């Protein structure tokens, strides 16, 4: 039975609060759709929080004590040069440089893609790959960490990836994006619900991780989340004023460079790039800095709080506003298509609450120096 389209899902909210939140989301999504309708062919049909990206946990502020604790440890003085390096997932050096962040030709104006501004970035390191299921499992086995999706007991999953048995047990959906369903038992170990597993995809990106979960992992690994500026600088791979990490053409010489949606969304994904869901983290050619799947495949968290108002004067290692409600995510996912979610461009951006999770949301880490043993 198809799930009725409700404006919001929150099994943990009082009934009165839920009604109010439903009304608020309906108003917000309607406004977002009206704004985006006039942004041209490249614009998505829904705001990031309503359809293109990942549904948000409504007003939830899940326990982030572990993430904050790990963050404090990560900000402690680093090890001195010469100490033995940890065995860690591959990181690549990102050289210092100046680049144009954002764009003066925004495709989704309300996302705050504009204006173009010159930004200087110090040298740092970036994970060559999105954090995989295998890498995240090492973290969980070492620490006993429970993700917020596991604590809440559910997470959002794209309907097209669900079994019929799981769908029959779902009574609610997101009105603005009915292909997003809240699935009990969906988490990083069970990306499509309790009858799914990651055993056959250890090298795929870990999914259903909140911003707090990502911070906890990166800090445990001696790393951190990249800033939005670092992420976008890395995405461009040394190229200037280009849409994608490899240039301006989506498929140069007919070759696929990213895992995105082909076909009519959300009805048919033809999988012309070889995948209908996520791909292994080393799929597709790397960009000029050696980064794989920096766009498409899975959305990636950054450390910045969300804002659509950018200072053109903050030109050295910008870190975004000091506070906010949502965190910035970049890169788009396997669900993105130009007709609906043209957010697999380096300048594109979206947002989610720090405790939100879904079946297209992952991350990769950055570091000022390569992690070392204590």
Swiss-Prot record:
Region ranges (Interaction with sulfatases): 341-360
User: Catalytic activity, per the record?
Assistant: L-cysteinyl-[sulfatase] + 2 a thiol + O2 = an organic disulfide + 3-oxo-L-alanyl-[sulfatase] + hydrogen sulfide + H2O + H(+)
Stated EC number for the protein is: 1.8.3.7
Q: Where is this region: Disordered?
A: 61-84
Cofactor requirement: Cu(2+)
Record note on what altering residue 224 to W does: In MSD; loss of activity
Residues folding into a coiled coil are none
Sequence positions that bind Ca(2+) 2: 130, 293, 296, 298, 300
Q: Which InterPro entries match?
A: CTDL_fold, Sulfatase_Mod_Factor_Kinase, SUMF_dom, SUMF_sf
Q: What is the effect of changing residue 333 to A?
A: Loss of activity
Query: Which disorder is recorded?
Result: Multiple sulfatase deficiency: A clinically and biochemically heterogeneous disorder caused by the simultaneous impairment of all sulfatases, due to defective post-translational modification and activation. It combines features of individual sulfatase deficiencies such as metachromatic leukodystrophy, mucopolysaccharidosis, chondrodysplasia punctata, hydrocephalus, ichthyosis, neurologic deterioration and developmental delay.
Remaining remarks = The resulting 3-oxoalanine in the substrate protein is called C(alpha)-formylglycine by many authors. It should not be confused with N-formylglycine.
The name on file for this protein is: Formylglycine-generating enzyme
State the species of origin: Homo sapiens
């Amino acid at each position: 039975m198809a799930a009725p389209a409700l404006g919001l899902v929150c099994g943990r909210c009082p009934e009165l609060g839920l009604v109010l939140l439903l009304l608020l989301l309906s108003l917000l999504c309607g406004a977002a759709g009206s704004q985006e309708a006039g942004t041209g062919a490249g614009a998505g049909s829904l705001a990031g929080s309503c359809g293109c990206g990942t549904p948000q946990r409504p007003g939830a502020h899940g326990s982030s004590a572990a993430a904050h604790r790990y963050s404090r440890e990560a900000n402690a003085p680093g090890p001195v040069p010469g100490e033995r390096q940890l065995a860690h997932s591959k990181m690549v050096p990102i050289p210092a440089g100046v680049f144009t962040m954002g764009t003066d030709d925004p495709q989704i104006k309300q996302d705050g893609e504009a204006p173009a501004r010159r930004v200087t970035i110090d040298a740092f390191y970036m994970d060559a790959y999105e954090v995989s299921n295998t890498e995240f499992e090492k973290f969980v086995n070492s620490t006993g960490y429970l993700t917020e999706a596991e604590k809440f007991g559910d997470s959002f999953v794209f309907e097209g990836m669900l079994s019929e048995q799981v769908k029959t047990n779902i009574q609610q959906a997101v009105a603005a994006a009915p292909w997003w369903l809240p699935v009990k038992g969906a988490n990083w170990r069970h990306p499509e619900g309790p009858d799914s597993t990651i055993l056959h995809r250890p090298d795929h990106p870990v999914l259903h991780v909140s911003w707090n979960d990502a911070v906890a992992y990166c800090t445990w690994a001696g790393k951190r989340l990249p800033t939005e500026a670092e992420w976008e600088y890395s995405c461009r791979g040394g190229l200037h004023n280009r849409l994608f990490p490899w240039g301006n053409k989506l498929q140069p010489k007919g070759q696929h460079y990213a895992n995105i949606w082909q076909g009519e969304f959300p009805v048919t994904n033809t999988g012309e790039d070889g995948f209908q869901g996520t791909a292994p983290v080393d799929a597709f050619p790397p960009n000029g800095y050696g980064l794989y799947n920096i766009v498409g495949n899975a959305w990636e968290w950054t450390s910045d709080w969300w804002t659509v108002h950018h200072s053109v004067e903050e030109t050295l290692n910008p870190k975004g506003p000091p506070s906010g409600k949502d965190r910035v995510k970049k890169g788009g996912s396997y669900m993105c298509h130009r007709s609906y979610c043209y957010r697999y461009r380096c300048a594109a951006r979206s947002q989610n609450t720090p405790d939100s999770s879904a079946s297209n949301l992952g991350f990769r880490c950055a570091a000022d120096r390569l992690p070392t043993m204590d």
